[in-house]
Amino acid sequence: ATKSPYYDAITTLLKNRMKYVSGGQSMKVDTFNGKEILSSVRYGKDIMTADQTTGVAETSKHSGMLTLIANNQDFSLGDGTLKVNMGKLHANQAYRPLLLGTDKGIVTYENDAAAAGKIKYTDAEGNLTFSGDEIKGYRTVDMRGYLGVWVPVGAPDNQDIRVKGSDKKLDKTFSATEALDSQVIYEGFSNFQDFVEKDSQY
């Protein structure tokens, strides 16, 4: 079978979700020269806020993820910088790209060794800072704008931070829980949900 241009990026994200994606989430949109970029941060296992540094798991420091998305091929930071708070627990920590937008398309980095020349460090407050040379819009076969995904360096190859399924009954139909949050099909692919065909099925 012929792979689509998006195959490697999607496969890399799905494989690494169970290794890195957990904890609280923060999303923000910054504007540079009238064009927007979205930053989405997951703080890591058991880390629910940017300020939390206690009550965390052994895997907390080596989990978490940053996703950067711009939907404009002309996006540019110009002379500005983009600062993203990864959380205080991640202060002075090394991060590497998992996916990186380039003029040749989205490049995937399966492990720390593959991304050895692309390491960035957070500051004493846990901020990652990007310059205009690092983030800019592109028009390629798999991207019109910019996409970058960053993860902590040093996670074991077999790290799995997924939460075990829960059969606990809740009063509300939709509730945010760690167990629910671990389910990719619920979060990202709601088009797989079945729809009723008659009133009696409600």
Residue ranges and their predicted role:
Residues 24, 34, 81, 104, ...:
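Intrinsic-disorder/low-complexity loop/linker signature
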